[in-house]
């Protein structure tokens, strides 16, 4: 609905703009004296025919705002530039194209020029997609006991309902980005969330174990797309400096979803009044609310698609087919871009040491993080005798840690802004990407500390408050590492940033899905103490990563062809 209104408003504004800048905008009398703009338009018409300019300026027709339409009408359209077709696309036969762009740096059509309120309202709504799909990924893990009883399978087998969702999430991330870069953000949100709702409902109605697994996998496959797209929406509306605080908002919402869900799902599983399948109905209700909010209130944010709309409107208004947006001249097919989207992340992972190490760091973080979905039953349920619902409530500690990390964002933002201003005053173009690693350096030591702390204080003789407080430190560490890693890869790889992030997304969700399955026998056979000690030792090996790259990252980048 909001996109439709945006489209109609664009047409109205264009009609007014063309009338304002047209040759007869001042009056209805066609015999009025031509303005300077009209003379420039006439010059352009002569230049296209090889005739010298009337005003003697000798300007190229490809750098002036005047446009001569096919019917001979002369108009000036803001934001449109003349370009030779051969410079852009070999398959276009016409001599000259009118390339449609934004009217200028302050054009309100450009989402980066929206008001602060409109930007944050948009981000707030689309950001809930990250929370939603995170919620959907984990909530089934809280009713494993009820699911195994209903379908007559083992605890490990029923954990596949969560694991397959995460596996599908990883595989889907490889192909998600090109779709929103072809049709726009909103169609992807609405279509994929609608399909997610269908498969979530099917999972809730699944008559047997196989059907449940199949529907959960398909739900994860389509659920990854809005998760991937909302990061693109953020980039559409915020400039790089503002992303310093906008990106943590996205991260916080994405992390809260998977670990708020157990706080609700565990009580659903424990309840004697409602079915355990209400975990799916809660997800379905939330998905319907989010999809409805996007449909009603979120405008399209992808700039190239907005310019495509503008070009289409100009073709309809003027009757001239030469108005084109650059996205319409893209010669690479969707299939080709999907193939590149699938292959380039692996190419970067196996050939780029930065991508490989930070991806492995996130893999370690995620195997611990999602291993807790099933591991908390061993830590709090079997050690302290907590009920199923109370075990779910213990995830509040991790969520508090996420929020503490989020509370540090203003400090990180203003510190970065001050260093950036100093760098510019000293004649530098900006800060090196390594300046993004401060958050990770704050959080990295707390990852092994929190795991050892939790592992060796989880005894019935020691208060449950000790491992619960350790989980707060763990949540703080995870959030800081994640935010810094993503911002560092974005700043380092620039053109290839999307592929670098997809690489990290794919491997960490595959690892997370595997850990959901493995954690049950691991905690059962090794026990809580040695399981967390093992994970703590692995995290110790990765702790130096942000410090090493902060000191030597610039040297590695100088030797690397894919980084600036």
From Swiss-Prot:
Membrane-traversing stretches: 120-140, 159-179, 187-207, 217-237, 249-269, 278-298, 353-373, 389-409, 437-457, 462-482, 500-520, 530-550
InterPro entries: MFS, MFS_dom, MFS_trans_sf
Subcellular localization, as worded in the UniProt entry: Cell membrane
CDD domains in the cross-refs: MFS_Tpo1_MDR_like
Membrane topology reported for the UniProt record: Multi-pass membrane protein
GO terms assigned for molecular function: transmembrane transporter activity
Applications reported: Kojic acid can be used for several biotechnological applications, including use as an antibiotic, as an additive to prevent browning of food materials, and as an antioxidant. Kojic acid is also interesting as an inhibitor of tyrosinase. Finally, kojic acid has also been shown to have strong nematicidal activity.
GO BP, one annotated term: kojic acid biosynthetic process
GO cellular component, one term: plasma membrane
Gene3D superfamilies (alphabetical): MFS general substrate transporter like domains
Sites where a glycan is attached: 113
Matches recorded under Pfam families: MFS_1
Record's keyword terms, sorted: Cell membrane, Glycoprotein, Membrane, Transmembrane, Transmembrane helix, Transport
Induction annotation: Expression is controlled by the kojic acid gene cluster transcription factor kojR. Expression is also positively regulated by the secondary metabolism general regulator laeA. Finally, nitrogen deficiency also positively regulates expression. Expression is also regulated by the kojic acid related proteins kap1 and kap6.
Functional note: MFS-type transporter; part of the gene cluster that mediates the biosynthesis of 5-hydroxy-2-hydroxymethyl-1,4-pyrone, also know as kojic acid, a by-product in the fermentation process of malting rice that acts as a chelation agent. Involved in the secretion of kojic acid. Improves the antioxidant capacity via the accumulation of kojic acid that is also a strong oxidant.
PANTHER family xrefs: MAJOR FACILITATOR SUPERFAMILY, MAJOR FACILITATOR SUPERFAMILY (MFS) PROFILE DOMAIN-CONTAINING PROTEIN-RELATED
The name this protein goes by in its record: MFS-type transporter kojT
Organism: Aspergillus oryzae (strain ATCC 42149 / RIB 40) (Yellow koji mold)
């Amino acid at each position: 609905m909001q996109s439709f209104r945006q489209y109609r408003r664009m047409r109205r504004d264009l009609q007014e703009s063309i009338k304002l800048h047209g040759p007869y905008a001042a009056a209805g009398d066609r015999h009025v004296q031509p303005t300077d703009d009209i003379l420039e338009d006439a010059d352009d018409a002569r230049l296209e025919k090889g005739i010298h300019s009337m005003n003697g300026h000798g300007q190229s027709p490809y750098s002036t705002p005047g446009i001569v339409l096919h019917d001979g009408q002369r108009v000036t359209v803001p934001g449109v530039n003349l370009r030779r077709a051969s410079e852009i696309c070999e398959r276009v036969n016409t001599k000259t194209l009118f390339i449609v762009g934004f009217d200028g740096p302050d054009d309100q059509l450009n989402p980066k020029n929206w008001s602060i309120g409109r930007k944050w309202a948009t981000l707030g709504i689309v950001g809930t997609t990250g929370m939603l799909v995170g919620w959907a990924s984990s909530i089934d893990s809280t009713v494993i006991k009820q699911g195994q009883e209903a379908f007559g399978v083992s605890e490990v087998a029923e954990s596949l309902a969560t694991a397959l969702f995460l596996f599908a999430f990883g595989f889907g991330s490889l192909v998600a980005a090109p779709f929103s870069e072809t049709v726009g953000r909103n169609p992807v949100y609405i279509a994929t969330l609608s399909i997610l709702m269908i498969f979530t409902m099917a999972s809730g109605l699944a008559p047997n174990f196989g059907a449940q697994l199949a529907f959960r996998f398909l739900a994860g496959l389509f659920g990854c797309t809005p998760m991937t797209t909302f990061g693109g929406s953020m980039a559409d509306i915020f400039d790089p400096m503002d992303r310093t605080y906008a990106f943590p908002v996205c991260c916080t919402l994405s992390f809260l979803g998977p670990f708020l869900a157990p706080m609700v799902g565990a009580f659903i599983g424990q309840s004697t009044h409602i079915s355990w399948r209400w975990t799916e109905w809660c997800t379905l209700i939330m998905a319907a609310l989010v999809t409805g909010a996007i449909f009603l209130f979120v405008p399209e944010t992808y700039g190239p698609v907005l310019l495509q709309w503008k070009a289409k409107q100009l073709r309809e208004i003027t009757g001239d087919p030469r108005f084109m947006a650059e996205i319409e001249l893209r010669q690479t097919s969707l299939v080709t871009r999907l193939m590149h989207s699938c292959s380039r992340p692996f190419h970067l992972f196996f050939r780029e040491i930065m991508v490989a190490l930070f991806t492995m760091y996130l893999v370690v973080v995620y195997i611990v993080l999602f291993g807790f979905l099933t591991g908390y039953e061993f830590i709090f349920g079997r050690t302290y005798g907590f009920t199923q619902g109370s075990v779910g409530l213990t995830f509040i500690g991790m969520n508090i840690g996420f929020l503490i990390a989020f509370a540090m964002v203003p400090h990180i933002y203003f510190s970065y802004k001050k260093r950036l201003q100093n760098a510019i005053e000293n004649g530098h173009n900006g800060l090196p990407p390594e300046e993004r690693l401060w958050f990770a350096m704050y959080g990295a030591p707390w990852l092994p500390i929190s795991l050892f702390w939790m592992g060796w204080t989880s005894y019935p003789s020691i208060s449950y408050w000790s491992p619960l407080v350790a989980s707060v430190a763990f949540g703080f560490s995870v959030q800081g590492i994640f935010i810094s890693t993503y911002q560092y890869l974005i700043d380092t790889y620039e053109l290839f940033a999307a592929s670098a992030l997809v690489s990290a997304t794919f491997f960490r969700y595959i690892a997370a899905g595997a850990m959901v399955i493995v954690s049950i026998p691991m905690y059962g056979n090794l026990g809580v103490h040695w399981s967390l000690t093992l994970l703590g030792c692995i995290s110790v090996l990765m702790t130096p990563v942000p410090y090493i790259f902060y000191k030597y990252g610039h040297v590695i980048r100088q030797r690397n062809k894919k980084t600036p």
